[in-house]
Amino acid sequence: MKKIFSLLALASMMVLAMGTMGASAAKAPQNDKAVVVVSFGSTFDDTRTKDIGGIEEAVAKAFPNRDFKRAFTSYIIMERLEKNKGIKVNDLPTTLKELKKAGYKDILVQPTHLLHGEEYEQKVLTTVDKFKGDFDRIVVSDPLMVGKNDFAIAASAVATQFPTLGKGEGVVLMGHGSPRDNNQSFGNTYKMLQETFDKMGLPVVVGTVEEVDTPNVDEVLEQIKARGYKTVHMFPLMIVAGDHANNDMYGDEEDSWKSLIEKMGVKTIGHLQGIGRNAAVQAIYVQHAVAAEAGVQR
């Protein structure tokens, strides 16, 4: 009888041991590498999915060895998303804190900003600097345009969204603008981009929604008149087609770009799609991320 009890006890111990092993296997060590795609954000569902989501998907696919995380920088957008739609998106500091707590050691941060402006520097670079001691490695990738060589690449990518243009037709691109941009060593980004489109022989006028920046809407109107366009296709030179695109660019208000251009007798055609859904633009961000991971950033 004692022998039977001993065998039963041994069997029970083996079952418990196997259960413990199974539990340990289920909790196998997680991946300690992550890629964080950080964007300004948007409350517009379509553009958040296709533009921001398009870049996120491309980057995540390029780094299958890294767990993907999303972060936004606009607190107003994050608050509205959570309050009105029940969508919770963390800012970059919170995302990095959670990654640290979860045991991640190698972090790649890919911003979806267009240039080294205030948003990129104050919301991304400054934040990452504060977390450099919390990970074995954390690197930040470049925005879309960094130096002179990027303009032709970016312009060619953006141009893939343009329709076939007829005689008297042109394209108007509305960028956001940045006070920091005016101090760039290589000159004003938007003016340089304009020169690039001109050299490519494309009928494009580039402007910024910020009136204090340049080229502003007045300069855009002057260019449309000087070039003699009868019809202009309007696109946001922004990752998302959000508030600026839907209201400032192509809204029905008297001071929208659409209204001001139509007052000149020029027909407008709106294309409310951000450049984030553009596969060629996505490819540029992926290239920057790959370079950052390899430690060959400019």
Please describe what each predicted stretch is.
Residues 2-23:
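Sec-dependent N-terminal signal peptides of Gram-positive bacterial secreted proteins and lipoproteins
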Residues 26-298:
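Active-site-proximal alpha-helix that buttresses catalytic centers in soluble enzyme cores
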